[in-house]
Amino acid sequence: MELQSRSEALAVELARHQNGDLKKQLHERQPRIAALSDKQALGSTTAVPVTGPQVSSLQRLAGQGAAVLPQVRPKTLIPDSLPVTPGRDRPPKQPPTFQKATVVSIKNPSPALPTANNTVNHVPTPSSQTQALTEPTAITSPLSSAGVAYAIISTSPSNAATITPSTTVPVASDGIKVQPLLISADKKVIIIQPQVKTQPESSAEPEPPTEEPSQGAQATKEDQPPSKENPEKIAFMVALGLVTTEHLEEIQSKRQERKRRSTANPAYSGFLETERKRLASSYLHNPLFLTARANEDPCWKGEITHDEFCAACKRGASLQPCGTCSGAYHLSCLDPPLKTPPKGLWVCPKCQRKALKKDEGVPWTGMLAIVHSYVTHKTVKEEEKQKLLQRGSELQSEHQQLEERDRQLASAVKKCLELKTSLLARQRGTQSSLDRIRALLRLIQGEQMLQVAMATTSPTPLLAGPWTKPSTTTTMRTTLQHPQNHN
């Protein structure tokens, strides 16, 4: 009684949360549900004929017409408070205690999906045929692994639980069991057990000798993995907002993989790097820029055998091997030459040119074209900037040389000026000396002319007169006679 009250409360709660839009969608997909009913019968199916009184809620739904359909709300079918325990977890030595089963019946003959909004009718079964079920088949399908509705089969205490030999329903005494249901056009509720092989609709009414499989066969069927779901069935489930557990895990794993790749790929995570790192001169030496063949790890294809001679000068000793080919080079043979050996993976100029040539032939589309054009534009601008900086450095060196030459010329001019000043001073001194000498010569010449005039005017000879001491003028004239002749 407690389980019955719980099922009724659950039906009321589900009826309260019905949505008109979902009803309309389910009504639109009703033909597809009927078409897929044959393909959804996986495994052994058992048909349950309509027995017992009809359910009142189903009668109300049938009276409303085909436009009003119950809503499939799989999230609230089984509350967390209800225990779900497989019957095979029971200890093997414990005698099985069978209880009264519950049969779901429907009045509407048209193919439809039973939902949790339909109430469950408890149909007592006779206890005289206890041999029909030796052990309950406890197959509980997960909520998210089937594309059909589920029926809640409740149990109540009883001594045994059997149905007619031609129709059997898997029942367990541990609690609530969930089975996917399909309703065929002949007023039968088909309880589907997931299995690998797909059986046609004609297998819904098997012969009596083959309807009671053994415990070993049932255990074997339970242990077999489920087959791949039908794509149309999965599409229908996605339209209703239902996904299987495997599909959900696959979606989450793909999402995590995309996130991991987008964050771990250095070719796309370095878009916000500095301009220096995006230059062609910097990313050419980056091994990630090379092709997949050039960047291939040597451990996958074996160790690379490098040449014993330099590829440029054809001589050996102290070679730098290339990380992507068999070539080796001297550090001094490279253009430009290297002073210290590079650390890590080093790529020779030949492989760099090959990678650049191959990269230029790849067409760029979309965002890659924008990024490529931006990088190309920045590269051209950087090259122009480098040229201007180089020209500026050359002009600056020329300016320094001219300044040095100017300083040298200034010092030379200063020395010339000093020499000129000294020469002018010496010239002035010499000129003054010459002026004095000329004055002296004029005096001497005047004195001589005076003596000649006196000699011509006086008839008496000089010896006749008294002897006098010669004057200083005469003495100086005789002294300066030799310098005057020299000049």
UniProtKB/Swiss-Prot annotation:
| SUPFAM superfamilies with a match to the protein in the record | FYVE/PHD zinc finger (SSF57903)
Q: Where are the zinc fingers (PHD-type)?
A: 307-354
The UniProt entry, under Pfam families, shows: PHD
Task: Please list the GO terms describing molecular function.
Answer: zinc ion binding
Keywords from the named record: Coiled coil, Metal-binding, Zinc, Zinc-finger
Q: Is S-adenosyl-L-methionine among this UniProt entry's keywords?
A: no
Q: Where is the composition biased (Basic and acidic residues)?
A: 220-229
Stretches of the chain forming a coiled coil according to its record? 380-420
Q: Does the keyword Translocase apply?
A: no
Q: Which InterPro entries match?
A: Znf_FYVE_PHD (IPR011011), Znf_PHD (IPR001965), Znf_PHD-finger (IPR019787), Znf_RING/FYVE/PHD (IPR013083)
- Region (Disordered): which ranges? 196-229
Q: Which PANTHER family match?
A: PHD FINGER PROTEIN, PHD FINGER PROTEIN 21B
**Per its record, how is this protein called by name?**
PHD finger protein 21B
Q: What is the lineage of its organism?
A: Eukaryota, Metazoa, Chordata, Craniata, Vertebrata
Tell me the name of the encoding gene: Phf21b
